[in-house]
Each structure stands twice: as C-alpha cells, then as structure tokens.
C-alpha cells in the first residue's frame, strides 16, 4: 500500500476510497538553523533554499507556503534530504512519515520540525468506473478499524521503530 494524498484535482482523474490516515508536510532542517527556524513560516525568505520531491504535495506546499524561498526539486525523496544533510539546502519539505524515519536514521545530521503544516488525507486510488471496488475498500477499512486490526498496524509502523532494524 502506498500513500496517495486525496486532492480535488486527483479526484477528477481517479476515484478514492475513504482516507485511511491523515498526514501532512513537515520540515527536515539543516543543522545550525534550529535556533533561527522554529516554523516552516520562517523559511519563507529568499535567503533560504528549500528542496522537495518533484510532482508531490511537498512540491505544491513549498510553492504555496514558501514562495519567497529558493526552491529546488528532485526526482527522489532521498536526493532532496541528502542535500540538507550535506549543507547544500536549508530545508526539505516532504511527508511527515518519511521525514520522521529519515531523521531517526540520521541522528545528529539534521533537525526534524515534526509539526505538520498541511492537512493531507491518504487514500487508495481506484480507476474511474469501479464503484464496487471503492465500496469493498471502504467496508474493509471500516471492518479493520472496528476490530482493532487498524490500531495494531498503526502502532507497528508509526508508533514503533523496531521495524527499521529489518531494513539494514
């Protein structure tokens, strides 16, 4: 399962099931800026270089909320985050879950401003014209939320970092 932010524009192209989680954009900040930058709003200045992944809601959020900052876009999340670690950019704007994991895997190399500054419901995307599948997904989500399965999955992947050890 992959995250896709449910937006009005995307909803013109595909249908969405009900959201299964709500996330938002957060900031990975270059070391040395933590006293100067306390919020994403502080980055809206031409002296700062902000990076994000091309074509994502991070890209859109940076353009919308940080229009005065210099913006550079990358093909992958990792390329953008590495720019911040290497001091070539001041901040990386991207999905909170990615930024939380990346900062925990790179302790002392950057600062995570972990309060999301956007509202982004994630949902499964389904091709137009398949209401039965959307209905099935919605019923499935309701079932696992009601029987405790959703809470167990959420705890494993979002409240614990034990799974990260299996990545190495």
Question: Where do the protein language model's features map onto the residues?
Answer:
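A ligand-binding cleft/hinge motif common to bilobed small-molecule-binding domains
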Residues: 3-13, 61-63, 83-86, 90-118
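Ligand-binding clefts/hinges and TM-proximal coupling segments of bilobed small-molecule sensing domains
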Residues: 57-71, 112, 142-168
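Periplasmic-binding protein-like
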Residues: 22-29, 96, 100-142, 160-168
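Acidic, polar ligand-binding/catalytic clefts
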Residues: 1-42, 110-111, 115-117
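A cross-domain feature marking catalytic cores of carbohydrate-active enzymes
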Residues: 4, 54, 154
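Bilobed "Venus flytrap"/periplasmic-binding protein-like clamshell domains
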Residues: 26-81, 96-98, 131, 136
């Amino acid at each position: 399962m992959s995250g896709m932010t449910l937006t009005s524009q995307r909803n013109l192209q595909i249908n969405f099931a009900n959201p299964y989680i709500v996330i938002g954009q957060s900031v990975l900040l270059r070391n040395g800026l933590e006293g100067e930058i306390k919020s994403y709003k502080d980055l809206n200045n031409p002296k700062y270089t902000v990076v994000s992944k091309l074509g994502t809601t991070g890209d859109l959020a940076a353009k919308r909320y940080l229009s005065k900052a210099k913006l550079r876009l990358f093909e992958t999340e990792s390329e953008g985050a590495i720019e911040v670690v290497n001091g070539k950019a001041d901040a990386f704007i991207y999905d909170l879950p990615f930024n939380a994991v990346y900062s925990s895997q790179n302790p002392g190399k950057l600062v995570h401003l972990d309060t999301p500054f956007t509202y982004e419901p994630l949902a499964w995307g389904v091709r137009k014209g398949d209401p039965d599948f959307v209905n099935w997904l919605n019923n499935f989500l309701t079932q696992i939320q009601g029987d405790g399965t959703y809470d167990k999955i959420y705890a494993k992947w979002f409240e614990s970092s034990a799974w990260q050890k299996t990545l190495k």
